[in-house]
């Protein structure tokens, strides 16, 4: 059986995407099957209907996210979105000079980086980085053990610096931008208390403690003459790193295993900001994964949520981020096996195993354009121990596309909510000024169908005229540079 494609295959360039002011035609991403029409399988037809995100529905989602943004800016806990004050009131200008460092802690590895900055003309003169694994023992040990280990590795990293490439100005202490990707209540640019551990960490004696103080004390104990100048998360680091190269960057979005977004906000639009000055701008960390209103939840989303580590929380994240897309597909396929003959008269045992299908598998199956979908068949055989006929392979890809289409379009609605909030206060796009969204994360980078669905939603909601002034830029791994730059921007010298 051969597959028919309705349009020529074109894949958008990943580095940057600017929307045309005219409607596009004949522009789709390669996909074995797209969920544009209802399936002949009743279970799949209902699932597609439950996941549908037509433009009017997406508009309601974007409006609800915008309402939550305003509520969160008005008062702490005002809405699903926390709208956290980051205290980043100054972004990199390009004038920064000197040697600065970045530490990124957010999973089973941490990364350290050194950056020698040469000002407007020379920008980044030199940079080095190193990634170090964190053992399971340290992840559930004490704060002294974890931060002591990090400080010792930082000291080793500094000791290996090549004198000809990196130069610390005499009389200055080394300064560090600390990317700490765990829930924190930030109290200033260089202090914040841990709310709770996530991602498998359960370090004792830390909750409610100032994470910056813990790291500073550990560095001092190891004889390292270094201090934390800026505490940020990966979204803020991405925005700052991208802004260094492009002054039109206004939004930073992470779409990977997890998801988050931050943006440049006018201080006068933040009622909960109790400061003497309401002029200028600051960066808001939306924590948009916590959004939960009017989302197209299915029985499979509800089941997955009930068995998650945080039931009832972060429902938006569970629909749009890479950690969950494969698991939703697995649950749908299991139900189809149990109620139909998708893979014959039995459900493969591996299909009952949580996380047996990962988002990277969905991507590979959707990119299969062979006549017999042989790559789909190989993935199903290798990871689920099932030999699927052509009809089953097509059904599987339809399920993948349905889940990914919903995720990409919902992510697009979230970005539109932020862009429209910025537009309301600044009238940037309406006056023809370019607005850039800096994107990072493996889901955005490696899943072309997801990217396309997200971009489609942006154009549908903004309209072609406003969308033509929006640029989506893939800015891989700039959060480390951004953290170092924020250390420079907030230097005590």
Swiss-Prot record:
Q: Which reaction does it catalyse?
A: a D-hexose + ATP = a D-hexose 6-phosphate + ADP + H(+); D-fructose + ATP = D-fructose 6-phosphate + ADP + H(+); D-glucose + ATP = D-glucose 6-phosphate + ADP + H(+)
Give all residue intervals belonging to the Hexokinase domain. 38-488
Which pathway?
A: Carbohydrate metabolism; hexose metabolism; Carbohydrate degradation; glycolysis; D-glyceraldehyde 3-phosphate and glycerone phosphate from D-glucose: step 1/4
Q: Where does D-glucose bind?
A: 198-199, 233-234, 260, 287, 317
Q: Where is this region: Hexokinase large subdomain?
A: 233-477
Q: Which domain of life does this protein belong to?
A: Eukaryota
Q: Which Pfam families match?
A: Hexokinase_1, Hexokinase_2
Q: Which parts of the sequence are annotated with region: Hexokinase small subdomain? A: 93-232
**Its Gene Ontology molecular function terms?**
ATP binding; D-glucose binding; fructokinase activity; glucokinase activity
Q: What does the function comment of this entry state? A: Fructose and glucose phosphorylating enzyme.
Q: What is this protein called?
A: Hexokinase-like 1 protein
Could you tell me which species this protein originates from?
Arabidopsis thaliana
């Amino acid at each position: 059986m051969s597959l028919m494609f309705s349009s020529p295959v074109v894949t958008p360039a990943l580095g940057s995407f600017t929307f045309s002011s005219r409607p596009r035609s004949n522009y789709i991403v390669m996909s074995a099957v797209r969920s544009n029409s209802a399936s002949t399988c009743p279970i799949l037809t209902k699932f597609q209907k439950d996941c549908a995100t037509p433009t009017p529905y997406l508009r309601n989602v974007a409006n609800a996210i915008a309402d939550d943004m305003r509520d969160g800016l008005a008062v702490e806990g005002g809405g699903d979105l926390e709208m956290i004050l980051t205290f980043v009131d100054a972004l990199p200008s390009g004038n920064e000079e000197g040697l600065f460092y970045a530490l990124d802690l957010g999973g089973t590895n941490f990364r350290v980086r050194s950056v020698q900055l040469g000002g407007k003309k020379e920008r980044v003169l030199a940079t080095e980085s190193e990634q170090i694994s964190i053992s399971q023992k340290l992840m559930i040990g004490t704060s002294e053990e974890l931060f002591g280990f990090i400080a010792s590795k930082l000291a080793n990293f500094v000791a290996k610096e090549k004198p000809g490439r990196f130069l610390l100005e005499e009389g200055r202490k080394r300064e560090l931008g600390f990317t700490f990707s765990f829930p924190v209540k930030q109290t200033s640019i260089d202090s914040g208390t841990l709310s709770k551990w996530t991602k498998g960490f359960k370090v004792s004696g830390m909750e409610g403690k100032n994470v910056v103080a813990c790291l500073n004390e550990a560095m001092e104990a190891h004889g390292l003459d270094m201090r934390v100048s800026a505490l940020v998360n990966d979204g803020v680091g991405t925005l700052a790193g991208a802004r260094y190269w492009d002054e039109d960057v206004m939004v930073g979005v992470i779409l990977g295993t997890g998801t988050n977004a931050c943006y440049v906000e006018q201080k006068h639009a933040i009622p909960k900001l109790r400061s003497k000055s309401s002029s200028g701008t600051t960066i808001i960390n939306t924590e948009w994964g916590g959004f939960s209103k009017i989302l197209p939840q299915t029985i499979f989303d509800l089941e997955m949520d009930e068995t998650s580590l945080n039931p009832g929380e972060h429902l938006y994240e569970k629909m749009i981020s890479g950690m969950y897309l494969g698991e939703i597909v697995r649950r749908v396929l299991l139900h189809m096996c149990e109620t139909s003959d998708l893979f014959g008269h039995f459900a493969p045992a591996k299909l009952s195993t949580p996380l047996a299908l990962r988002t990277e598998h969905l991507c590979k199956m959707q990119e299969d354009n062979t006549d017999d979908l042989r790559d789909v068949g190989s993935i199903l055989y290798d990871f689920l121990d099932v030999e699927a006929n052509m009809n089953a392979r097509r059904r599987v890809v339809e399920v993948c596309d349905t889940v990914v289409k919903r995720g990409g379009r919902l992510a697009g609605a979230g970005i539109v909510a932020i862009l429209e909030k910025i537009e309301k206060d600044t009238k940037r796009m309406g006056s023809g000024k370019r607005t850039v969204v800096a994107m990072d994360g493996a889901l955005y980078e490696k899943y072309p169908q997801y990217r396309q669905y997200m971009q489609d939603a942006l154009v549908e909601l903004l309209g072609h005229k406003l969308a033509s002034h929006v640029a989506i830029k893939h800015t891989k791994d700039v959060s480390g540079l951004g953290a170092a730059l924020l250390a420079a921007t907030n230097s005590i010298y």
